């Protein structure tokens, strides 16, 4: 294949994945040159960026833009939603800020405080002071997501110095409302927010590289032509005891590996 013109190699590479292109760039100098082509990386960038998207300055190549969107999520829609790309596939990822979520009693200072923490994407996160009724819901338009892709939604959080009341499981659901998909079903499940609460495999939180925890709320498949909203929620409203110490970063929606 080294005898093929570089533009032909670039065309072939554009039919693979970003991960494959990075691997194949080590084959030879002509592959390395073709792997840096804008034609290749245009194929991996979305054809329809979300409204409000503005490419960062100082990125002269499409490859640089791609990896900037992988490593540095961009804020859109003010400061309530971040947009990024998944490294292996180039599929779209989003994270909804805590302020974009419907948190019951979230505007009552005796129950929740809105605080700023370093090294976060958004200006504020929500710190739980005390509630008995915990209910958090987020919605996102399914048309923002990449077609023909399996997605998962993750609740992203951490604890302050004195968490209390979270030893019991928390109920979650994921609803594909008003879509044309045949999979527009509710996925109720029980998860643990505490790592040592004995939750089932896959239902306990995982520590992320950024120092926050995440726990999966559910999965859904985005088909071409799907319309409507995805509603993601978690709640604990049955326990007769107070809950406190939870810090909410947001909900992240990204492709399943």
Curated annotation (Swiss-Prot):
Cell compartment(s), UniProt: Nucleus
A GO BP entry: protein ubiquitination
Pathway connected to this protein: Protein modification; protein ubiquitination
GO molecular function, one term: carbohydrate binding
Principal location listed in the UniProt entry: nucleus
Keyword annotations from UniProtKB, A to Z: Nucleus, Ubl conjugation pathway
Stretches assigned to the F-box domain: 1-44
Assembly information from the UniProt record: Part of a SCF (ASK-cullin-F-box) protein ligase complex. Interacts with SKP1A/ASK1 and SPK1B/ASK2.
Domains: entry comment: The F-box is necessary for the interaction with ASK proteins.
Record-given protein name: F-box protein PP2-B11
